[in-house]
């Protein structure tokens, strides 16, 4: 019994004297955000990731404006291809709120990604690009401008689909409380103002090219005319009868009772859109 007590005492002393940080070690080969921005090549791959969220305009499934209306009808009901196009199902009156088609809010049902995930990656890029070593300042400014335009475009696409949406200026930190995570929706005018703000910053920076000079390596990259086109589309949408004095949306208000859609027609919106 005495030997047993000695043994337990020694074991207890060994445990208490162990290095406290022995198990507090990050395993090797674990990817971190720092690794994505520790050189130009990895940062450029992250830039490409920010681009991957762009919906395909020419894709009949991903672009709701092609088949979701009643401008185009396909009469062969037994055609396998058309019966499986989610946008065509919207035109047939099958859209629903519990499991919506073309769900760019969460991703799925014809939408390859959540655009809010795209906005999160854009914010990560903007927050970390400054730390990339060996990157020419001219190229850094161009990449920043491109991702700002992507942020503006993703906000515009969500606005066009859902009306008032939350503005995602910055990412929430991982330890955010429940209250901090419940981001309220902003008004249509606020969202459009933010889109214009981002594009105006890009225009003022003069960082974007007017045309793509190297087609084989830069085809599809954002140019200055593309950025201005997004701004114009956003301003026209804000000036349109849908969001400019539309009293049918008078009950669309925030938690404080503020209207999320402009209830008084404003002619100046068309002046801004010209």
Residues covered by each model-derived region:
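Bacterial Sec-dependent N-terminal signal peptides
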Residues: 1-28
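Extended amphipathic alpha-helical segments enriched in small hydrophobics
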Residues: 151-152, 231-233
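Membrane-proximal, proline-rich intrinsically disordered regions
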Residues: 18-69, 253
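Short coil/turn linking the two alpha-helices of tandem helical-hairpin repeats
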Residues: 159-160, 166, 237-246
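A solvent-exposed, charged loop/short amphipathic helix patch at secondary-structure junctions
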Residues: 245-265
């Amino acid at each position: 019994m005495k030997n047993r007590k000695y043994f337990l005492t020694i074991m207890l002393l060994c445990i208490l004297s162990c290095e406290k940080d022995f198990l507090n070690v990050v395993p090797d080969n674990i990817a971190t955000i720092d690794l994505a921005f520790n050189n130009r090549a990895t940062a450029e791959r992250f830039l490409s990731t920010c681009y991957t969220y762009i919906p395909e305009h020419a894709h009949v499934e991903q672009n709701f404006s092609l088949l979701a209306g009643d401008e185009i009808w396909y009469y062969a009901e037994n055609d396998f291809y058309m019966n499986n196009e989610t946008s065509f199902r919207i035109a047939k009156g099958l859209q629903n709120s519990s499991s919506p088609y073309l769900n760019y809010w969460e991703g799925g049902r014809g939408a390859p990604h959540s655009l809010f995930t795209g906005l999160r990656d854009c914010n990560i890029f903007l927050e970390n690009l400054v730390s990339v070593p060996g990157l020419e300042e001219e190229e850094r400014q161009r990449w920043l401008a491109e991702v700002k335009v992507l942020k503006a475009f993703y906000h515009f696409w969500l606005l066009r689909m859902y009306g008032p949406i939350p503005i995602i200026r910055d990412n929430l930190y991982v330890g955010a409380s429940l209250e901090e995570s419940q981001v309220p929706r902003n008004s249509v005018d606020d969202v459009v103002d933010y889109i214009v703000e981002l594009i105006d910053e890009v225009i003022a920076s003069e960082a974007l090219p007017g045309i793509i000079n190297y087609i084989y390596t830069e085809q599809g990259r954002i140019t200055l005319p593309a950025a201005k086109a997004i701004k114009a589309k956003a301003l026209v949408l804000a000036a349109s009868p849908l969001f400019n004095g539309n009293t049918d949306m008078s009950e669309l208000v925030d938690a404080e009772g503020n209207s999320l859609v402009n209830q008084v027609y404003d002619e100046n919106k068309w002046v801004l859109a010209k």
